[in-house]
Swiss-Prot record:
The active site is at residue 11. Gene3D superfamilies: HAD superfamily/HAD-like, Putative phosphatase, domain 2. One of its GO terms (biological process) is carbohydrate metabolic process. One of its GO terms (molecular function) is magnesium ion binding. This is Fructose-1-phosphate phosphatase YqaB. It comes from the Bacteria. Mg(2+) binds at residues 11, 13, 167. Pfam families: Hydrolase. It is an enzyme of class 3 (hydrolase). It comes from Escherichia coli (strain K12). Magnesium. Can also use other divalent metal cations as manganese, cobalt or zinc.
Length: 188
């Protein structure tokens, strides 16, 4: 089905790994310390964004005087301990396994590299990917194309010869901005 592509790129959270419930739990825990609230629909709309950008939206919603990068670090620490105990692969991992060795593959994620690498290794999936590009590897995050362009570069594949598997509107916009085809996994 994906034979015409020279490289396959996968978002991580919500696409190949079921991490979203744990991310929400970590946000609830961290925000509870500050008495802050968040809007679940607004959070879903920000799927694929780096943690600091989500923190900024929460701070603005609550009109709080906090540093979004510091709040993001707290959430990252909270989620790191939770995820290794709770994360499960999603069915799209079967696509990853079936294309292993047939095409170069990469992960392009809005998560921090330490978390992405730890999760993929923990689940025995890291060896399937030629590259992992995370939020701390690029200056401009999804919906900018930088994450996926760096994936293509690290795989040694032209961007127009890549397909991206995504579960978030920001990610699909980023793929298109990179000149890549996108598969919206929410429709599979």
């Amino acid at each position: 089905m994906y034979e015409r592509y020279a490289g396959l790129i996968f978002d991580m959270d919500g696409t190949i790994l079921d991490t979203e419930p744990t991310h929400r739990k970590a946000w609830r825990e961290v925000l509870g310390h500050y008495g802050l609230q968040y809007d679940i629909q607004a959070m879903i709309a920000l799927n694929g964004s780096p943690t600091w950008r989500i923190a900024q939206a929460i701070i603005e919603l609550n009109q709080a005087d906090l540093d979004p990068h510091a709040l993001a670090r707290e959430k990252t620490e909270a989620v790191r301990s939770m995820l290794l105990d709770s994360v499960e692969p999603l069915p799209l991992v079967d696509v990853v396994k079936s294309w292993h060795g047939r095409r170069p593959m990469a992960v392009g994620t809005g998560s921090e590299s330490a978390i992405a690498e730890a999760l993929l290794a923990h689940l025995g999936l890291r060896h399937y990917f030629d590259a992992v590009v995370a939020a701390d590897h690029v200056k401009h995050h999804k919906p900018a194309p930088d994450t996926f362009l760096l994936c293509a570069q690290r795989m040694g594949v032209q961007p127009t010869q890549c397909v991206v598997f995504e579960d978030a509107d920001f990610g699909i916009q980023a793929a298109r901005a990179a000149g890549m085809d996108a598969v919206d996994v929410r429709l599979l």
